[in-house]
Structure formats: structure tokens, C-alpha cells
Amino acid sequence: SNGAKADPKTVGQIMQFRVVLPLNGTDTTANPALGAALRPTPMVKLTTGGVPPASFDQKRQLTLNEVMGMPQGIYPGGPLEILVNNSKWMAAVSETPRVGATEVWEIINLTADAHPIHLHLTQFQLINRQSFNLNKYLKAYAAAFPGGGLDPMTGLPYPAGVYMPAYGPPLAYNTANADGALGGNPAIGPFLQGPIRLPEPNENGWKDTVNMYPGQVSRIAVRFAPTDLAAGSTTAGTNNYSFDP
């Protein structure tokens, strides 16, 4: 990477394979020159054109938060930890979808960085992304915190209307906000800016990880059912897996 000549004893070597034996049968692997589809059965699509599924069981709005440290002496403050919905991993379980359900999750990235988000035990599809007014939303978000507790940085109680790291969401998780979303956060709708941004070609289809960019809402369609079932064919409460999740 620094432009130095490759060492011929290590990375400067190339391995070459020469296949000279004739085939024992018909080659059934894909031939790109023929232009045929690699997947004979089209992939199930929960979303097309940046539009959420025609029907879904629940919407959630969850935040990505960076907890910052205070400057001490000559050392500048910086990120101490990254939290999902302002909650530590040892916090109580908050996302409890029903098996078979289809949900729309809107991930609100309040940090300065892109974060790859991975969901366990299920795949999902990226719907779209959209920018929002970060400064105005942060003010509304901070204003929703009740105060109390103890700020470990200052040793004093948090005043009301100030962001409380690792407190969890500022509002009741299971009470829908003005956007009709669970998660315990102020609705992001009034702060959205500009048009939606469609997924890149490589982001289409089923994914287990997608990048969530700063200052944007990333919307994903999550279905808690096998990926080969047709869109709209699953029902919340019905287990279509071959095991008990």
C-alpha cells in the first residue's frame, strides 16, 4: 500500500491453476456470456421503488447515539460508546416483535459516523434513506428527557431537558409517537428534509447488515419469517420457520 515493490518471497508470488482434464459431464454452472439469470426463481421483494411494504404490523423509530466524554486536561473529549436507542446491551429487551410479523424500522442516526447495523436471527430489506434537520431534532430529543439520576461526568443530577446518556429513549417505548411509531423517541417526521434516497444496486434484496449514515433516517423492512415466502403471505403470530425461534 506504500508503493514498495512486492517481496517475491511472499506477497509477490502468484498461484496459477491450470485445468486440463476434460469434463466428465455437462457444465451446469452459470455462463455470464449467455445472459441467463443466476436465480431461476425471483427473489421475494418486500419493497420496491423506495416504498414500504403494502401492509406491515408495526413501525419503530430507533436512534443511534454517541456518548461523548468531557475534555480532561490536555486530552480532548471524544466518543466513549455507541448506543442503539440510547440503551446499553444489558438493558431490558425492548424490541419484541411477533413471529411472522412484518415491521418497518426507521433508524435515526444522531452520530457523526456511519454505522453498519446487523439484526440477529432475521434478514431485512432496505427501503430508502432520507436526511433530517439534525440540530432541530436533537433539541426536541433532548427536551424530552425528564432529568434526575446522576451525571457521572459532573457528579450532579441531570436537569430536565438535557440528554441523558444510556437512559434509554426519553419517552415511553410502547406509546406510539406522532408518526405512529414505537421506540420512545420524538417523531422524526416534522424534521425530514429533501427527497428519499433509494438503495444502491448492491443494497437491494435481503441483507443482514446495512450502513446507516449520519444525519439520515434509514428505513428497513423486517420480516420475521423465512425469506422465500411471498410478500404478504405471512401473519403475525404464525410461525413459518422449521424451528421454534
Q: Which residue stretches match the model-derived regions?
A:
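Extended terminal and domain-junction accessory segments
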Residues: 1-191, 196-203, 213, 223-229, ...
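Short strand-edge motifs at loop-to-beta-strand transitions and within beta-strands
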Residues: 206-210, 216-220
